[in-house]
Amino acid sequence: MPIGVPKVPFRSPGEEDAAWVDVYNRLHRERLLFLGQEVDSEISNQIVGLMVYLSIEDGTRDLYLFINSPGGWVIPGIAIYDTMQFVSPDVHTICMGLAASMGSFILVGGEITKRLAFPHAWVMIHQPASSFYEAPTGEFILEAEELLKLRETLTRVYVQRTGNPLWVVSEDLERDVFMSATEAQAHGIVDLVAVENSGNFT
């Protein structure tokens, strides 16, 4: 039986009684954001909206984006990445579980020195895939041209933010490359691997 989103007590400043709000609402007030699903337009718009709102509310306090995502659509993922570069606060990215495909692209987009993976997390990178498997030839050619542009964009970002040479990134994007947390750190996708029992999110 589904229980819905858990609720937790929250007391607004100046109020005596606490109100019950859903746990994500409470965490958002602490500037903690979550990408825990496939990247699509809906979740992208939610995260972009939250980042912009929290940046306007207080541009000096950092944001924390927790990622456990199998990837998803490229353009919505790029929208999240671009917003992370646009907003005033630094955006910490934290990989928990899996950051694959566009999940890893968003992970690498965090503020350099503030990208972290949990010790048993996994990261996977690869090139963008086509959605036209049985399309007419003309549509497939147009799709291939757009995919090439997107691949160049993703490659350029990975090169810039990992410090790896172009040829290394290009070769990695040719196939699915899975990395442990420490391998992702060596690859420049994250800067730190969390130590167990050292977290403090209060």
UniProtKB/Swiss-Prot annotation:
Its EC number is 3.4.21.92. PANTHER family: ATP-DEPENDENT CLP PROTEASE PROTEOLYTIC SUBUNIT, CHLOROPLASTIC ATP-DEPENDENT CLP PROTEASE PROTEOLYTIC SUBUNIT 1. The keyword Transcription regulation does not apply. It catalyses: Hydrolysis of proteins to small peptides in the presence of ATP and magnesium. alpha-casein is the usual test substrate. In the absence of ATP, only oligopeptides shorter than five residues are hydrolyzed (such as succinyl-Leu-Tyr-|-NHMec, and Leu-Tyr-Leu-|-Tyr-Trp, in which cleavage of the -Tyr-|-Leu- and -Tyr-|-Trp bonds also occurs). Component of the chloroplastic Clp protease core complex. GO terms for cellular component: chloroplast stroma; endopeptidase Clp complex. It is found in: Plastid, Chloroplast stroma. The active site is at 101 (nucleophile), 126. PROSITE patterns: CLP_PROTEASE_HIS, CLP_PROTEASE_SER. Keywords: Chloroplast, Hydrolase, Plastid, Protease, Serine protease. HAMAP family: ClpP. Pfam families: CLP_protease (PF00574). This is ATP-dependent Clp protease proteolytic subunit. Belongs to the peptidase S14 family. One of its GO terms (molecular function) is serine-type endopeptidase activity. It is an enzyme of class 3 (hydrolase). SUPFAM superfamilies: ClpP/crotonase (SSF52096).
